[in-house]
Amino acid sequence: ALGGAAHVTAAAALGHVAVALIARRVPLHLWSYLSTQAAHIVVIAAVVVWMPDAFAHGLWAAYAATLHPLAILLGGVIAATLMGGPAVGLLMAPWRAAAQIEGLDNAGRIIGLMERALIYLMVMIGEPTGIGFLIAAKSILRFETASRDQKASEYVIIGTLASFGWALAWGFAAQSLIAMLR
């Protein structure tokens, strides 16, 4: 599929396995998580630098011009949504017990995933102003909690801002990388 570049694929796989094995030996904290994710991105970047024409040969040759932006778009979705959940969760861990937020099991995780996906989408379609409506809607829905419980309110605000910031950063990063390909 990569035009005979099995060694590049093997190097990428070994790089990711090495990062994962090292990460298992380090206590899980926000900085160790972010470092691990950065290391995975470095592995991908190293493969791209090592063999920038990987899609120019083999089965994917006819689609090479489309695949690069699509790979960045999908990588950005994964980074903004799935990588963002654990990052925000680890950031918020010290305050979780004090906030004592009651609600459905995993609802915060699902809400965060959906809000990061919406923010990423709004950035990618060139409508980041729509994020203001998302902030307003979430504020209205959380108004009662905010007026009742200051700790829970602060917990939600910090988590929301971290989640929004994460998605915005990945959205604008993906948008910039795609623009560089043009």
Which residue ranges define each predicted feature?
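Transmembrane alpha-helix boundary/anchor motif
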Residues: A13, V17, L82, P86, ...
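Transmembrane helix-loop-helix
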Residues: L2-G15
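Active-site beta-strand/loop microenvironment that shapes enzyme catalytic pockets
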Residues: A12, M122, G132
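Re-entrant/interfacial helical elements at transmembrane boundaries that shape
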Residues: G132-S139
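Interhelical loop and helix-boundary elements at the membrane-water interface
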Residues: V19-V49, D53-M124, L141-W166
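Juxtamembrane boundary at the C-terminal end of a transmembrane helix
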Residues: W170-R182
